[in-house]
Curated annotation (Swiss-Prot):
Its EC number is 3.1.3.25, 3.1.3.94. It comes from Bos taurus (Bovine). Pathway: Polyol metabolism; myo-inositol biosynthesis; myo-inositol from D-glucose 6-phosphate: step 2/2. This is Inositol monophosphatase 1. One of its GO terms (molecular function) is glucose-6-phosphatase activity. Keywords: Cytoplasm, Hydrolase, Lithium, Magnesium, Metal-binding, Phosphoprotein. Activity with myo-inositol monophosphate and D-galactose 1-phosphate is inhibited by Li(+), Ca(2+) and Mn(2+), but also by Mg(2+) at concentrations above 3 mM. The modification Phosphothreonine is found at residue 168.
Length: 277
């Protein structure tokens, strides 16, 4: 049987490339920066422009499909995931990087049907790296097949995480205490490039062994999640249970052994789900 979603994926790859052009062009100009949920949660006119471009283009071609977009949700739309084919879009993952010219900025497009990830695209605009993953077909970066590492020993692992955009002292305390606990196991190190999507792609590429974070949103992980699993990795909840796209937390790991060990070590931050009011 023909793959019903391949055409959607091909179209999304083209759109992600076009969105990357807009992002690169915008970096040459003065930008208008706005603040969302905290002084460190930033949005620019380019985020809004790219999301509008992506959703408008996809809606024209696939009018019956649903959408969850970071900037649409910020403007008051709900992020409710149904069984309908749904595009989950982060127009610029790494807005703070974008604002500062720090060179890790991604366009992320995830496509979910019956609440299951079908394909994901993460385009690293300044590196010109197009990461793609399609259910059952593998994960690639610029056409090269991706494969996770085989590192199961946490003491020999390189992890990726972020400090997040919350500036609430208690949340910051938990984030830093989790990092301290992991570093002192010890492990080889902790890195972070400032975007959830690219951190996950680094796990898919075998450059890092696992990524964990709490406080992310569905649009941060919907594109990269399937890239990780198609590269041979696993997605788990930070409790060690099954991954839930709307839960705002994830461990993306090269293997389950490492993911479960991370889950055992970290303290959980209480968060409101993406699909709660």
């Amino acid at each position: 049987m023909a793959d019903p979603w391949q055409e959607c994926m091909d179209y999304a790859v083209t759109l992600a490339g076009q969105a990357g052009e807009v992002v690169r062009e915008a970096l040459k100009n003065e930008m208008n920066i706005m603040v969302k949920s905290s002084p460190a949660d930033l949005v620019t006119a380019t985020d809004q422009k790219v999301e509008k471009m992506l959703i408008t283009s996809i809606k024209e071609k696939y009018p019956s499909h649903s959408f969850i977009g970071e900037e649409s949700v910020a403007a008051g739309e709900k992020s409710i995931l149904t069984d309908n084919p749904t595009w989950i879009i982060d127009p610029i993952d790494g807005t703070t990087n974008f604002v500062h010219g720090f060179p890790f900025v991604a366009v992320s497009i995830g496509f979910v049907v019956n609440k299951k990830m079908e394909f994901g695209i993460v385009y690293s605009c300044l590196e010109d790296k197009m990461y793609t993953g399609r259910k059952g077909k593998g994960a690639f970066c610029n056409g090269q097949k991706l494969q996770v590492s085989h590192q199961e020993d946490i003491t020999k692992s390189l992890l990726v995480t972020e400090l997040g955009s919350s500036r609430t002292p208690e949340t910051v305390r938990i984030i830093l205490s989790n990092i301290e606990r992991l570093l002192c196991l010890p492990i080889h190190g902790i890195r972070g490039v400032g975007t959830a999507a690219l951190n996950m792609c680094l796990v898919a590429a075998g450059a890092a062994d696992a990524y964990y974070e709490m406080g992310i949103h569905c649009w941060d992980v919907a594109g990269a999640g399937i890239i990780v699993t198609e590269a041979g990795g696993v997605l788990l909840d930070v409790t060690g249970g099954p991954f839930d796209l709307m839960s705002r937390r994830v461990i993306a790991s090269s293997n389950k052994t490492l993911a479960e060990r991370i889950a055992k070590e970290i303290q959980i931050i209480p968060l409101q789900r993406d699909d709660e009011d």
